[in-house]
């Protein structure tokens, strides 16, 4: 179940068991019980929890059983989140993170390759165009200044 305030870019890979949480129980009140924020409990008229949106970029891979906690607002294009990771803060474009809490492991590509990928906007191609350009896009990573 993906919360309604979460948006995904194109060509994302989301493994099984991924959980995305958009709000925390209020820990500064007399109770953390849902009676304070959930209208289904019959004590409040509307949902009282703040749920800011989460934007997940294009070509993001979220590994099996990863958890994305409240407070995360952006996962950048091309990011990779390792299986079982607990993401507590934003993940940059093309950053590989893993662990509990998730920490940067390395970048997928160097700055020139990232710039070439971003300018190509390959994720906007229809499937036929993409199929025709796979070789060109792979070559671009080998020589980002001159993919021809």
What are these regions, as identified by a protein language model?
Residues 24, 79, 91, 109, ...:
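Short, flexible helix/strand-to-coil boundary loops that buttress conserved ligand/catalytic motifs
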Residues 59, 78, 85, 95:
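Catalytic-loop signature of eukaryotic-like protein kinases
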Residues 26, 93, 101:
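A generic "binding-loop/recognition-motif" signal
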Residues 76, 90-98, 107:
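Short conserved catalytic/interaction loops centered on acidic-Pro-aromatic/His motifs
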Residues 33-67, 101-148:
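C-terminal segments of enzyme domains that contribute to small-molecule binding surfaces
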Residues 1-75:
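Flexible, glycine/small-residue-enriched loop-and-beta-strand segment within the central core
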Residues 72, 84, 90-91, 102, ...:
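Short glycine-rich donor-binding/catalytic loop of glycosyltransferases
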